[in-house]
């Protein structure tokens, strides 16, 4: 079943915020991964086939200036990615690391069978931050 088929005409099954983020995803796209200010997190869930790439661009004082995502997966995975990028923009790295899959799942009212989507978003945030920090380690 495609993501569109999954969400199409089933208003009672998914919260309106999931449908909104699916139909109008925020921050879709890519950043230049060769830019030292950009961190990339790529995660996947083999059980359902969802793959999520989330990128951050970090500026002064470790504040995330921009965030982009590309997700191949269900509507809940797309909505989780979209919401995650909205939440981390203008936050510091430390603030962004505090965002949990539970926060994302609660905001989107994800059903239990879709909680792995919010876990992917949390993991992608952490991996993007780790990639950024690894790129910017001080030289010995």
From Swiss-Prot:
> Into which family does the record put it?
Belongs to the NifU family.
GO process terms (BP): iron-sulfur cluster assembly
Gene that codes for this? ISU1
Under the subunit heading, UniProt states:
Component of the core Fe-S cluster (ISC) assembly machinery.
Q: What is its main location?
A: other
Cite the annotated pathway. Answer: Cofactor biosynthesis; iron-sulfur cluster biosynthesis
Q: Name one Pfam family in it.
A: NifU_N
Record's function text: Scaffold protein for the de novo synthesis of iron-sulfur (Fe-S) clusters within mitosomes, which is required for maturation of both [2Fe-2S] and [4Fe-4S] proteins. First, a [2Fe-2S] cluster is transiently assembled on the scaffold protein ISU1. In a second step, the cluster is released from ISU1, transferred to a glutaredoxin, followed by the formation of [2Fe-2S] proteins, the synthesis of [4Fe-4S] clusters and their target-specific insertion into the recipient apoproteins.
User: What does the record give as cofactor?
Assistant: [2Fe-2S] cluster
Identify this protein by name.
Iron sulfur cluster assembly protein 1
**An example Gene Ontology molecular-function term:** 2 iron, 2 sulfur cluster binding
* Gene3D superfamilies per UniProt: 3.90.1010.10
């Amino acid at each position: 079943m495609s993501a569109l088929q999954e969400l199409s005409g089933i208003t009672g099954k998914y919260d309106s915020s999931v449908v909104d983020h699916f139909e109008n995803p925020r921050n879709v796209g890519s950043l230049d991964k060769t830019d030292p200010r950009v961190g990339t997190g790529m995660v996947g869930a083999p059980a359902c086939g969802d793959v999520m790439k989330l990128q951050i661009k970090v500026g002064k004082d470790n504040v995330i200036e921009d965030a982009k995502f590309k997700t191949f997966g269900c509507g809940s995975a797309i909505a989780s990615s979209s919401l995650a990028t909205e939440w981390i923009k203008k936050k510091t790295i430390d603030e962004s690391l505090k965002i949990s899959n539970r926060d994302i799942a609660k905001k989107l009212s994800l059903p239990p069978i879709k909680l792995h989507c919010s876990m992917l978003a949390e993991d992608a945030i952490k991996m993007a931050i780790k990639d950024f920090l690894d790129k910017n380690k001080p030289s010995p």
